[in-house]
Regions:
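Terminal alpha-helical segments
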Residues: 1-134
């Protein structure tokens, strides 16, 4: 049996709420990087990627993921109709794959893992940001 996609309807103008979250979290990424705090940068990058994906899906579909594992966020982003959305949904999936490591596991991320999640989140944010402007 296929999993039911867990989403909620959100009015498109509310994209600004999710965009502001993403903007502030990306600022936190830069601050953490400047202090060589790789874990903090990675955690903020994951949260920024989720927020910017929500902003895109709210803007394009009027929907936001509410699933606990963020699978719906990846699926929604992939089908939102924006140019490059499928590729960027894959980026989001890769970012989310590192979330548990950064936040919960009993080992620290490698330098490569920490840097990779930040770079992927930055690419997702840079792709999404221009078409989310008011």
């Amino acid at each position: 049996m296929a999993k039911r996609e867990r989403t909620t309807k959100v009015d498109a103008p509310k994209r600004r709420v999710y965009l502001q979250r993403a903007d502030e979290l990306m600022d936190s990424v830069a601050d953490a990087e400047a202090r060589s705090h790789a874990i903090a940068a990675g955690v903020a990058a994951v949260q920024a990627a989720i927020a910017v994906a929500d902003a895109v899906t709210v803007a394009r579909l009027g929907l936001r993921s509410t699933g606990p594992d963020h699978e719906a966020a990846v699926a929604l982003l992939g089908r939102c109709g924006a140019k490059g959305a499928e590729d960027h949904a894959k980026q989001l999936k890769r970012v989310l794959a590192v979330k548990n490591l950064l936040e919960y596991e009993d080992r620290l991320p490698t330098e490569h893992e920490a840097r990779d999640v930040v770079e992927r989140a930055k690419r997702l944010y840079a792709w999404a940001r221009p078409f989310l402007e008011p």
